[in-house]
């Protein structure tokens, strides 16, 4: 089902490009700017089974987007400047802002060099447990479990279930099912228990995943001294906030900020909701982020930035630079607002 959805999106992007419809829709739906979502930036990996491919783009694709923005005379700005322009209604020039979620080491090793070429700022949203080396990027651990197994046994809703993982196709099917099940568990402790058991059964060192992929506090301290780099908060544990109590959500927000500020000795005023879609961030989370004192908070709901977003600063949409669609032809489609307009039923604001 997810592969079908991916194919449909790809076909839609190509259709917008080939028909030129994005040129017609740009004046209406491009808005005043775009906040881009990224996770990993690194060279392309080999292997047929890559269920998290959508979370990584190559340095060349990032460079292509930056070239497109510069040639289109679109300003590339920081989250601080996004906030200023929206609140002061300084919107005469279109802008783009680059945000990177989780705090992966490749943001420093690959993305920063590309951003420097264009003197382009970036904001990295850090999950504080990831920087501590105690976090659980469980979707990566799940990929590792399935990659090495010919079958996976798990108890889902009290029913013992055996999933075939002997081929790349069956691995993808199993990953999709287990990913959705794990993300939907009602509390983070349940997810921790289940992914921990899977990793133990299949000899995957879950604790090492975070340390191998994410920047430590010491690395972040050096990274954050780069003039182009901004740091935001991304919760403590990277849990699905919508599944937690008000008290837990507030603690995830404020404690993550406090830890980052203490470790890096700099203020943190921007937040990114873990997962960030409708199933993970809604009106309650938007209100709690505002109450916690964040100037802005970003979702992963697809959308361009319009002047009206100034009234919803803790519910800002983003546009994903998705590893499944690394085709330079679609870059003007992404910045035209045509794709997100169609996705949103031609609504400009989605903050409910």
Predicted features, each with a name:
Residues 64, 106, 110, 215-218:
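Short, well-structured alpha-helical interface segments that form or flank functional binding sites
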Residues 128-131, 302-303:
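Short beta-alpha junction loops
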Residues 110-114, 219, 284-288:
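A short acidic, amphipathic alpha-helical/loop segment
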Residues 1-99, 106, 137, 141-154, ...:
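C-terminal active-site subregion of NodB/CE4 polysaccharide deacetylases
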Residues 26-33, 37, 135-226:
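Extended, charge-rich helix/loop segments that form flexible
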